[in-house]
Amino acid sequence: MGVMEILVSTLEAVPGYRVAQVLGVVKGSTVRSKHLGKDLLAGLRTLVGGELPEYTEMLQEAREVAEARMLEEARRLGAHAVLGVRYATASVMQGAAEILVYGTAVRLEPAREV
């Protein structure tokens, strides 16, 4: 038996479906920091400007972990979708960031045409 696929959307509704049951807010978070050597390299890059790939990669990985944690919570509730998804980022300390992702877990059913 495969893992149930859960729709993740920033929308508040899914075209062709209606929300049959609101299961509540689900969230996932992680705090990440970079390796000291990579942090020093990124620090040097700030002197000349441009993208800091070390931090871009760190934040992308953190978003993926946070979203997976949110989806695990939604899966435990039996959700079909997580709607109104939002991401938040906060600096916790020098070189470390928290990523939080949250939304509303719902069960869906096909919309009835009138």
Swiss-Prot record:
HAMAP family noted in UniProt: UPF0145
Designated name of the protein: UPF0145 protein TTHA1944
Source organism superkingdom: Bacteria
Stored InterPro entries: UPF0145_dom_sf, UPF0145_YbjQ-like
SUPFAM superfamilies, alphabetized: YbjQ-like
Protein family per UniProt: Belongs to the UPF0145 family.
Disulfide bonds listed in the record: none
